[in-house]
Amino acid sequence: KGKAGSPYAITDYYDIDPDLAENVSMRMTEWESLIERTHKAGMKVIMDFVPNHVAREYHSIRKPAGVRDLGEDDDPNMHFSIKNNFYYTWGDLDLNDVRQSKPEFKAYSEKDAKIYEPYEESPAKATGNDRFDNRPGCNDWYETVKLNYGIDYCDAGGRSYHYEPVPSTWGKMTDILLYWASKGVDGFRCDMAEMVPTAFWSYATQILKSRFPEIVVIGEVYDPNQYRNYVKAGFDYLYDKVGM
């Protein structure tokens, strides 16, 4: 993934990757045309949905009018708040360990400082693979930040759950699912679904399926002990990549 990050570092949930378009300015029209052609051919469209984390530099430029961006109303002085979309750590983001172990980072910084654009966060957000300090390493998902679904991971007792009132992130992520379903998507492949609480999935799938009864929801879940819980939460299919 290197400096560019992985395709699972989402920069805008409401946009189409410009690299996939023939005409960048018409990328949404091209996407809608793709769905139409697929349906005419008798096939279905299953879209990737990455709910656990976003890019560190997430900023939606295509969100519908009136939609508040993720983190736009956050209080970064709060490590955890049910009103925040992200988790915040103490101190600035420190990627020194990544720079030292990733040659592409080192090459950029030493060769030409003008083209080297380091991630800057103050305070740093928690990293997508549940790292809650400000110094992710090269084996962490350092280019991503964890979304807050109402779980305080650093509570004195380990974890505490805060689902009432409904966390801000729940509403925003459900709206994203509804947006793409309204475009004609037939289902979603939910990346690392088990890193997101089943309480959210129950909330989101009930709303989604009440408006789009034929929608299919597929979850990436690795713990067999959790299969029943995720099926009860509204998933139609579960899978893992073990042995692939």
Where would I find each of the regions flagged by the language model?
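Substrate-binding/active-site clefts of carbohydrate-active enzymes
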Residues: K1-K172, I176-Y179, Y227
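Active-site-proximal helices and loops of the catalytic beta/alpha 8
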Residues: I35, H53, R62, G66-R68, ...
